[in-house]
């Protein structure tokens, strides 16, 4: 029977800090479980332990059924491996070993072509057939045709680094979901996928008979595909795990109820311990003057010792207190005016007016000009006023265009870049960036900068360089800079892509309170539903408005 069972897993980092503490989970046959949690709580480490890539320091892992694994780096492969190499990397062990044997035999035959090499090559071909190698190649043809639109014979030696992140993900997902593995571990399978591909993934996960544990930050995917949600939550003893046996729509209330119950249990435990301790102190004082109290003192001490040995109830998770404060400010009623605007080679001419206070989601397929539109706005438009020009470390590249794009009075753009790539930030520490201001934001002393970083959950990373941060940390820091710049027009390019669920929800709360205009490019369907206007960038170059999200 295919399943995954974790019993009291513990894991320590090289510096001795506990990462995972008493983690237990069962993923039953055919079930789909989403693994979520804040960045740094150990989600990928837990998958590595289940896969056998890392050993737990405490507890045990049991698995039933053949295991297939999609690791986190799929989608960002930039080495010289081929499509064949990628498909073999997620194939069953017997296929992978037989392929390596066949490759060595073929290379030896090409170099020498002796009778012995011919015999070895013939044996390697026979072994390849015995393990189902030719059937594997037939399946590869199905997978490359579905993911890349070309047969395996044409795709097999193509470099993986020539594929987009979405193509790499789709190819591996096709192989794993259509392969013989009964248990799948998928680390962020939705990253790099556009919305149609995410919908495809949802359908495949739901209809698959396989046992699947997947890590994701996509709330729509989790809500549609997961039968249960396992949450890694930080405590002082390390991350613990809680399982919600329902969908994401009921998750928050269930989590709030659970945390309230844990807090109440802890309050009662503290009260009981305080009462027992007071009892011991009372009998100790009396026993000092009355020997008849000695037995009562001993009984009270025994009760306190046994109470302590039983230990406190499960700890309440540490609060993930990310607090974003995007203030904004009043601007002209017409915040953005596009007049016969054409992004060269990307869109046809279009007109639009965006008003102060609008919440506009920019939707469409990859390569349709969405990010270019945001970048042109970040440059201040066609003829920017002095206070609308980009400054400091956040200067975008110019955008070729015809027509006009104007910003209204007092509209000061603040830009969140999709790639998080700002040359002026990369090799500087967070404290240094905050200490040295620019034309739009004041510098801050060490103590004040530390307080600001703490609100974004970045205080422990204060001395790290921007380039060394995780994608989620870089995202939070970019939002922090927008807060300090006093922007009245927020331009957000895929802001939730690398944010954990808690940070994404903190951003949504901050945007709801923001006094200004927000324009965001996004493929996050859950996030998009918080907007009220939608600009759709079509594959045909047309830009149109919609009253509801439309996904190509």
From Swiss-Prot:
Gene3D superfamilies: P-loop containing nucleotide triphosphate hydrolases
Keyword field: Antibiotic resistance, ATP-binding, Hydrolase, Nucleotide-binding, Repeat
E.C. designation(s): 3.6.1.-
Entry-linked InterPro entries: AAA+_ATPase, ABC_transporter-like_ATP-bd, ABCF_EF3_subfamily, P-loop_NTPase
Sequence similarity: Belongs to the ABC transporter superfamily. ABCF family.
Record-listed ATP binding positions: 37-44, 364-371
Range of residues in the leader sequence: none
Organism: Mycobacteroides abscessus (strain ATCC 19977 / DSM 44196 / CCUG 20993 / CIP 104536 / JCM 13569 / NCTC 13031 / TMC 1543 / L948)
Keyword ATP-binding attributed: yes
General function of this protein: Exhibits ATP hydrolysis activity and contributes to macrolide resistance by ribosome protection. Can also hydrolyze GTP, TTP and CTP but to a lesser extent than ATP. In vitro, rescues the transcription and translation activities affected by macrolides. Increased expression correlates with increased resistance to clarithromycin, one of the main drugs used to treat M.abscessus.
Sequence ranges assigned to domain ABC transporter in this UniProt record: 4-270, 332-552
Record comment: activity regulation: The ATPase activity can be inhibited by ribosome-targeting antibiotics.
Pfam families tied to this protein: ABC_tran (PF00005)
A GO BP annotation: response to antibiotic
Disruption phenotype: Deletion of the gene results in increased sensitivity to macrolides.
UniProt catalytic activity: ATP + H2O = ADP + phosphate + H(+)
Name of the protein in its database record: Antibiotic resistance protein MAB_2355c
Induction: Expression is up-regulated more significantly after exposure to macrolides (erythromycin, azithromycin and clarithromycin) than after exposure to other ribosome-targeting antibiotics.
One Gene Ontology MF term: ATP binding
């Amino acid at each position: 029977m295919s399943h995954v069972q974790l019993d009291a897993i513990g894991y320590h980092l090289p510096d001795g800090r506990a990462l995972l503490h008493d983690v237990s989970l069962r993923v039953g046959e055919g079930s789909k479980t989403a693994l979520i949690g804040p960045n740094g709580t150990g989600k990928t480490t837990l998958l590595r332990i289940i896969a056998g890539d890392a050993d737990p320091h405490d507890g045990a892992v049991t698995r039933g059924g053949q295991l297939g694994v999609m690791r986190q780096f799929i989608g960002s492969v930039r080495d010289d491996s081929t499509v064949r190499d990628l498909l073999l990397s997620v194939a069953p062990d017997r296929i992978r070993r037989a392929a390596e044997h066949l490759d060595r035999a073929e290379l030896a035959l090409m170099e020498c072509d002796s009778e012995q090499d011919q015999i070895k090559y013939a044996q390697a071909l026979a072994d390849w057939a015995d393990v189902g190698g030719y059937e594997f190649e037939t399946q590869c043809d199905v997978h490359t045709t579905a993911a890349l639109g070309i047969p395996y014979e044409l795709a097999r030696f193509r470099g993986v680094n020539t594929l987009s992140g979405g193509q790499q993900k789709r190819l591996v997902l096709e192989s794993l979901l259509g392969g013989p593995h009964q248990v799948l571990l998928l680390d962020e399978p939705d990253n790099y996928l556009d919305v149609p591909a995410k919908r495809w993934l949802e359908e495949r996960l739901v209809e698959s008979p396989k046992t699947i544990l997947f890590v994701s930050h996509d709330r729509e995917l989790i809500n549609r595909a997961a039968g249960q949600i396992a949450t890694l939550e930080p405590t002082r003893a390390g991350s613990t795990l809680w399982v919600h046996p329902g969908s994401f729509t009921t998750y928050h209330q269930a989590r709030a109820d659970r945390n309230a119950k844990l807090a109440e249990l802890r309050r009662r435990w503290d009260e009981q311990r305080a009462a027992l301790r007071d009892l011991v102190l009372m009998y100790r004082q009396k026993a000092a003057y009355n020997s008849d109290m000695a037995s009562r003192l001993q009984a009270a001490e025994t009760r306190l010792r046994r109470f302590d040995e039983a230990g406190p109830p499960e700890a309440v998770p540490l609060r993930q207190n990310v607090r974003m404060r995007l203030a904004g400010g009043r601007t002209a009623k017409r915040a953005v005016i596009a007049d016969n605007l054409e992004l060269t080679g990307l869109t046809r001419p279009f007109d639009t007016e965006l008003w102060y206070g609008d919440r506009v989601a920019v939707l469409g397929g990859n390569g349709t000009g969405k990010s270019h539109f945001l970048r042109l706005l970040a440059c201040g438009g066609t003829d920017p006023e002095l206070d609308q020009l980009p400054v400091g470390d956040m200067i975008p590249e110019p955008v070729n265009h015809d027509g006009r794009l104007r910003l209204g009075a007092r509209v000061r753009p603040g830009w969140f870049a999709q790639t998080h790539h700002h040359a002026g930030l990369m090799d500087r520490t967070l404290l240094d960036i905050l200490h040295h201001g620019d034309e739009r934001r004041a510098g801050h002393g060490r103590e004040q900068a530390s307080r600001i970083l703490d609100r974004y959950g970045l205080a422990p990373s204060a001395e790290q360089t921007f380039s060394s941060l995780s994608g989620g940390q870089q995202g939070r820091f970019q939002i922090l800079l927008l807060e300090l710049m006093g922007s009245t027009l927020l331009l957000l390019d895929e802001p939730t892509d690398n944010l954990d669920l808690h940070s994404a929800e903190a951003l949504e709360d901050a945007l709801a309170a923001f006094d200004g205009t927000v324009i965001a490019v996004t493929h996050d369907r859950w996030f998009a539903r918080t907007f009220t206007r939608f600009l759709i960038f079509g594959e045909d170059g047309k830009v149109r408005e919609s009253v509801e999200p439309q996904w190509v």
